[in-house]
Every structure is written in C-alpha cells, then in structure tokens.
Amino acid sequence: MTKLWGGRFTKPADKTAEGFTSSLAFDRRLYKQDIRGSIAHVRMLGRQGIIPAADAARIEQGLREIEAEIEAGQFPFRQEYEDIHLNIEKRLIEKIGPAGGRLHTARSRNDQVVTDVHLWVKDEIAAVQRLVSDLQGTLLDRAREQMGAVMPGYTHLQRAQPVLLSHHLMAYFWMLERDYGRFADALRRADVSPLGAGALAGTTFPIDREFTAAELGFAGVYPNSMDAVSDRDFIVEFVAAAAICQMHLSRLAEELVMWSSTEFGFVEMDDAYATGSSIMPQKKNPDVAELVRGKTGRIYGDLMALLTVLKGLPLAYHTDLQEDKERLFDAVDTLKACLTVMTGMLATLKFNRERMAQAVRRDFSNATDMADYLVKKGMPFREAHEVVGKAVLYCVERGKFLADLTLEEFKAFSALFEADIYQAIAPETCVSQRTSLGGTAPAEVERQLALAAEILSRRMG
C-alpha cells in the first residue's frame, strides 16, 4: 500500500512498526474537527487562487460525503494510513480523483493535527462547563430543599461548630464555580488557530490565516509558526483544570461515603447509585461515590503523563506529541462521566436530618459560642477560652455535655453565666448568630442561594 508520504522510501514499513506508530485507534474521534479544518483550509485555497475554485468545491463536497460515511458507519478505516487525517485524505482522493491531492497544499499534518485538537478542546470545554452547571444546579436545589437542617461542621474530622446543611452543600457550589472559571480561562488559550503554520516555518503560498481562523470560529491566530505546531499548553491547562475539578468531586464523594456509613448515618444512597456484596447480604455499598474518588488518581496521572511528555522536547514538532491525545481524551471522558453520575447521585440522595440534629446536640461544637457568650459579657477571649476548656474537661470526666450543666455548675466556672446561657449554646442559636458575610446564619445562606441562582440564570441565558 503506497503511503501518501512514500516517495522518499524504497521499502514498505515494518508491520510491527506500522502498528506501533498508528494513532487511528484513538484519533478517529477527531474526524469532525478534521473535516471542519479541511473545509476551512480548502475554501481559503480556492479564495486565494492557490487551487482552482472548481477543485475547491469538489473537495468540500467530497469531505462532506466522507463525514456522512463515517457517521453512517460505512467509512473504510485502514490502519496502514496511520491516522484519521491520512485516512480521510486517502478516501477523498479515491472519491474525487487527483483533485483530492490538492487539499494538502500549503498545509502540514503538524498544523492540521493541532488545529483539530484545538477545535476538539473548544467543543469539550463547552460540554464540560454544561455538566458543571448541571451539578451546581443540583447542589443549589438540594440546598434550598434542606434549608433549616443543622449538622455538625468539622475540622480535622472532629466536630467543630454547628452549620446548616445547606451551607455545607453550597461550599461545593462555589468550588465548582471556580472550576467553571478555570475552564473559561483555558478556553482563551485554546481559542487560537495554528492552521497555516505549516510544518514549522510557514508556507511559500499566499495563504490567509485570518480567514481560516474566522471560518473555524477562532478568536485569533498564533503569531509564531514554530510555537503554533509545538504548543500543547492548552491541553495541559485543560487537563489541569479537569484535575482540580475532579479533586473537588473526590472530596464530595469522600464525604458521601463517610456520611452513608452506619457511624455517621447522615445520608442514604439511592439504590440506583449503590451496589451489594457477593457474600454479605446486608451490604449497601457506595461504589459509585468510591469510583468517583478513585478515578481522581487517573486524571492526575493523565496530567503528569502530559507534562512528562513535554518536559524535554526541543522545537518544533516531534512524534512524542502523538501521546497527548490519549491522555487528553481519557481525562475529559473520565471527568464528564464523574460529573454526570455525581449529579444523579446527589439528586436522589436521602438526607437524615434527625440524625444530623442528634449529632449536633450531643457534642461540644457549641463550645465556641459559650466562649463568645463570656466575651460579650466583658471577659477577654483568651480567658474565656480557658474557662470553657475547663468546663469541657469537667463534662468529659462526668459523661455530660455543656447543655447538661446546671446553672450552679456554670457559675462555678464564672460568675458571668446567667440563665440565658442555655439559649446561647443551643445549636439553632449557634447557627443563627453567625451573621458575618459568608457565614452559616440562615439569612446569609439565603443570600448565597440567591446569588448562586442569579449566576446560573445568567449562564443559562
């Protein structure tokens, strides 16, 4: 089988080497972007008079027919043609004859391939952002629904201070909002056209790079042809943003795993998002959440693999860069799957509000409020901290909690305590008094919910 680049060679490729260098198995998913790029390129060639207008029209029609063949499952993919790009070009020549060979005028696979990847990344950033917004919408819905539910807030995985469940859920909304912004930032670097850079040095033909960039919807063009064909920063940035987003999903998944355990009992997974045991009939395992957590390492690995491929490459193009696609595709596919399944899991999650309320009543998470009570009575905070610490120790030694103490016991620690201490350290008071901006007081959480709803409303148009 004659290679499109075979003029220089005197013998065919070794079959093992041919299979080793082929990227068709994974880059065939770029067919839409490849055809889009080729149509823009051939329109420019015809417009500039570089090839006959009639040939440009025949090539465009042939490319559209090839796209239809691929989508109908009728395209004859051939591994010996190495990749999706040469498969399409070879098929074009078969369909329309020698005129198809004009398509690659003033173009190299170096700028062709990276143009395809730029287009794919732009498409996928938009898809990921939609999924992020969907998950944010579900978090917002559940936070509204659970407004008023009080639970322990944690530091060091120890009960720290009471918070609203809605406040806790909204923390993840804002993490995802930063993720959305990171993807938007990554889009700016992806939204630049390398098409027309050639192999590395540009071309001798009078091409119009601004025309092809506009045809493809790019915001601009690379100003340096060597940078254009060798840049993979935009891939690294996208995958880095994906890794950070996946880290947030992993943190949420970890909390759901813990909260669904008997030891916490704060939530129950819907049966559709849990599995059983092959030996223990009683088990209901949070496998979906565990897999979201586990797949985080996979995306981190994709990011590290990309950085390692790039770290020692001199300018300009090297076939090492073929290794970028599988890592990119895997990271994006994994993130999209995790965002989708997490949205469904959260939408169907059952919250045990009573169990959360019981937990917050039988702990010392109101100790800070007891100290604040003394400070408001005029005691310096450090002294109040010491007094409350001793009261906590007293309770621990006697199997009590602060709310169990009699007024006489309170007064043994400080004469400033009055009967209003019981109201001051009630969980509902602890929550409602935290009215600082961004705090867990109901009014502040309602403000968060309104702001979040406004953000999503603007985004959804």
From Swiss-Prot:
Keywords assigned: Amino-acid biosynthesis, Arginine biosynthesis, Cytoplasm, Lyase
Family annotation (InterPro entries): Arg_succ_lyase_C (IPR029419), Argininosuccinate_lyase (IPR009049), Fumarase/histidase_N (IPR024083), Fumarate_lyase_CS (IPR020557), Fumarate_lyase_fam (IPR000362), Fumarate_lyase_N (IPR022761), L-Aspartase-like (IPR008948)
EC code: 4.3.2.1
Subcellular location: Cytoplasm
Pathway: Amino-acid biosynthesis; L-arginine biosynthesis; L-arginine from L-ornithine and carbamoyl phosphate: step 3/3
Catalytic class of the enzyme: lyase
Any one GO biological process: arginine biosynthetic process via ornithine
Official protein name in the record: Argininosuccinate lyase
Organism lineage string: Bacteria, Bacillati, Bacillota, Clostridia, Eubacteriales
